[in-house]
Structure formats: structure tokens, C-alpha cells
Regions:
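Cell-envelope/extracellular polymer assembly enzymes that use nucleotide-activated donors
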Residues: 4-7, 36, 186
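Short, acidic, metal-binding catalytic loop of nucleotide-sugar glycosyltransferases
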Residues: 24-34
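A conserved acidic beta->alpha catalytic loop
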Residues: 25, 41-50, 68-69, 91-97
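Glycine-rich, basic loop-to-helix element that forms the pyrophosphate-binding segment
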Residues: 66-82, 103, 153, 157-160
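Short aromatic/hydrophobic "clamp" motif used to bind/position activated sugar donors
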Residues: 87
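Conserved donor NDP-sugar-binding/catalytic core segment of glycosyltransferases
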Residues: 98-131, 205, 209
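Catalytic donor/gating beta->alpha subdomain of glycosyltransferases that bind UDP-sugars
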Residues: 177-239
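Membrane-embedded multi-pass helical conduit in multi-pass membrane proteins
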Residues: 249-331
Length: 350
């Protein structure tokens, strides 16, 4: 096998301050092997060109500007221009620990794979809400271990905020598709179809900052639920009941509350109340387990307390997107999905 030469591909859109922190973290890597950085500006109005140029004496860095066509196409652009034989895909809102490159290099040298993913973590400098969001987005009780876990409830799917792709795999698949969000699992599904393997690299975590408010969090999770329906239609053999859980969780919870309110408003002890109380008790138990696991992982009582209601918000947002897309795609063939839900696809550049 040829020596691994990393090309770090970073799409960026109107976030020069973020790319500055990421590039700075790359200058502190303890890996002594050469690597290149490829930054692809996706049609930004607030570009990062000067910031990238300021690192030219510290990093082998190449900057490209292109019209806005989405993060997937930007990654493809970067990989097509990169000179490495292994691409490390990162989001611009990530910061790397100093051991990241050496950990990945050691893992690939020991057990090579054409595609890997790593965990995301919260840095101590993150805001309180960012830490809460990270806790909810990585807790196995709210994600099934799909994100940032070696052992989840489903086959590990690398995510593009922290993802490695060999040049061979990129050339075989053609890179990421037009769907967004969801371009990363869709890419992984096509890789699996071609016989390529994926793996989780323990220790190759990134600090994923997620510049996010409650409103943007709700919108993001809504989109995740929406595109999951599309992914299930395009790649049916990779469907998992796990991705139905937030929707079932939310629908049953709403039903329990409605039944309880009906009984209260009618001032009667309905025959179903015992089942309602049992159901609510199970939800309380689940919330306690989620709280305890978050407390154990984050080692913060405050984060654990706030994460519980945010978990309910996450499930409800996901469920709304999942149900809405499911209804809109009734009777729609796969060839017409993009026409029916165009907001989840980037257009080709003419």
C-alpha cells in the first residue's frame, strides 16, 4: 500500500471566523507527516480568502471559490482538486485536537478502510447551550448511538463533519449527491452497495461547535426527519426501525396527553386512564434514564437537566419532518421525489 497522504477538504459558507479556528488547530497537530488543506468557498458573500492566505506560511493550503451549490458538491470540488490519496472531510465549525491526524494515520495503518468516521465532542470553551445540544445529539438514548459511537443500534454511518474517504472510493462513487441534509448517509449507502466498508475510528473525535440557537436546532432536526423518508425511499434496504422511534415516541406522547386532557375536561374517570398513567410512567422512566446517562457522560447536572426537555423538542421536530415528508410522498414515484420536495435538493450548476 502506498504511503497515506492526507488532503483535508473543508467546505465553507459565510463563516470565516470558524475556518480560522479550524485552520489554527491544524497548525498544532502532532503528526509530522506532510498534508494539504483544501478550502472550498461555496459562493459566500463573507469569504475566508484572506484568512486562508494568512496560513500559507504554516500550512500547505489551497483556496477555491465557486458558485453556491451546497456542501456536498463543494466537497466533491475539493476532492477533485486535491492531490492526496486519502481525503479527510471536515465541517468548518469543527476544531481538531492535536492528536487527530496521528490517531487517524495509526488507525488506517493498522486496519485500512476506505471510509471512516469519528465522534464529535464539546470543547470546554463552548457555550452552555452548545454543550446541551451536543449532549442531546450524541446520547444513545436520543440517537440510538448512530452519531459518535462505535457500538450503536445500527450499522455505523460516518457523518461528513468528521469523515475519511479514500481517493478510490471517491472515484468509484462520484462523491456526494445533491440531497441536503442527508448527503453523507446517502453517500455511505452507495459505498456499501459497491462493497466498500466503513468503520468508526476511536479517538478521532472533533470538537463540533454547532453555531446554533433553539430555532435553528428545531429547523435542523426537522430537516433530518424529512430527508430520512427520502433516504428510505431511495435506499430501501438500509431502512431501520430505529429511525421510526422519534416519530412513534412523539405520536404516542401526544396521544397520552390528549387522552388525559379529555378525561380531565369531562371530569370523568375514563376506562383508559390506567393505560394512560402507565404510558406516562414509562415516559418518565425513559426521561430519567436519559437524564442519568447525560449526567454520566457530560459530568454536569445542569446540562443533564436542560437536555431532557430538549430531547422532547428534538423528537418532536424530527417527527414533524418525518410525517410531513411521508404524507407528501404518498403515491409519488422515486423519479419525482425531488420535484415534490425540492427544498431538500441543490440544483445542478449550469
Amino acid at each position: 500500500m502506498k504511503p497515506i497522504y492526507f488532503s483535508i477538504v473543508i467546505p465553507v459558507f459565510n463563516r470565516p471566523d470558524e475556518i480560522d479556528r479550524l485552520l489554527k488547530s491544524l497548525t498544532f497537530q502532532d503528526d509530522n507527516n506532510p498534508f494539504e488543506v483544501v478550502v472550498v468557498e461555496d459562493g459566500s458573500t463573507d469569504d475566508a480568502k484572506q484568512i486562508c492566505e494568512s496560513y500559507s506560511n504554516h500550512l500547505e493550503i489551497n483556496y477555491y471559490f465557486k458558485p453556491n451549490s451546497g456542501p456536498g458538491d463543494s466537497r466533491n470540488c475539493g476532492m477533485s482538486k486535491a492531490k492526496g490519496n486519502y481525503f479527510l472531510i471536515l465541517d468548518s465549525d469543527c476544531v481538531l485536537p492535536s492528536h487527530y491526524l496521528s490517531t487517524v494515520r495509526k488507525a488506517l495503518s493498522t486496519s485500512y478502510t476506505d471510509c471512516f468516521g469519528g465522534a464529535d465532542a464539546a470543547h470546554e470553551s463552548f457555550t452552555f447551550f452548545q454543550k446541551v445540544v451536543n449532549a442531546v445529539m450524541t446520547n444513545p438514548f436520543s440517537t440510538g448511538g448512530v452519531r459518535g459511537r462505535k457500538k450503536g443500534l445500527t450499522r455505523f454511518q460516518p457523518r461528513s463533519f468528521n469523515m475519511g474517504i479514500s481517493k478510490q472510493l471517491f472515484e468509484a462513487t462520484g462523491g456526494f449527491g445533491k440531497i441536503h441534509p442527508g448527503e453523507d448517509p446517502e453517500f455511505v449507502f452507495r459505498a456499501w452497495n459497491l462493497g466498500f466498508k466503513t468503520r468508526f475510528v476511536d479517538g478521532a473525535e472533533v470538537f463540533h461547535e454547532r453555531r446554533i440557537s433553539l430555532n435553528s436546532f428545531v429547523k435542523q432536526i426537522y430537516k433530518f426527519g424529512s430527508v430520512r423518508v427520502i433516504l428510505n425511499r431511495i435506499h430501501p434496504k438500509y431502512q431501520s426501525r430505529l429511525f421510526l422511534f422519534p416519530t412513534v415516541f412523539t405520536v404516542v406522547w401526544v396521544l397520552l396527553i390528549v387522552l388525559l386532557l379529555i378525561s380531565f375536561l369531562l371530569n370523568t374517570k375514563a376506562f383508559y386512564l390506567d393505560f394512560v398513567y402507565l404510558g406516562i410512567s414509562l415516559y418518565l422512566l425513559y426521561s430519567v434514564l436519559f437524564f442519568l446517562s447525560t449526567w454520566l457522560i457530560s459530568k454536569s447536572l445542569q446540562i443533564a437537566v436542560v437536555s431532557v426537555p430538549l430531547m422532547f423538542v428534538q423528537f418532536a421536530s424530527y417527527a414533524y419532518g418525518y410525517i410531513r415528508s411521508s404524507v407528501k410522498l404518498i403515491g409519488v414515484t422515486n423519479n419525482h421525489i425531488e420535484a415534490k420536495l425540492p427544498e431538500f435538493f441543490f440544483k445542478d450548476i449550469a
